[in-house]
């Protein structure tokens, strides 16, 4: 009986590891949106807008700037690496003055950034304070909106 217990002590963990490896087999090649057992929460992440974002990414040059809310920067970097994000949540990469200006931004700040970084695409959280600047400017239009965010494009003349 002691011998059976000793074997079970080694066999059971090996079986558990084997089952886990089989469950994960091939999933490292899938993006988080393609995996069946791992899903992004559509209430928090703009997964329903992703097809439009990827289509725009393909039609514009690599490194095209996109204006985005801070919390969506990492999402964009991961899913659409061809865009150059305006900001992301790695705050240590940005100067304190810039972060304060971003948080307290006025229309004049937004206009200055728009001139400095000529973005024609924007992805904003559904409750973003920046939405008022896009809604008030007739040059910007909504491409798509989901529960988490709004995708805008600027009419270029």
Model-derived features with residue positions:
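Short periplasmic/luminal acceptor-recognition loop of GT-C membrane glycosyltransferases, typified by
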Residues: 58-96, 120-125, 152
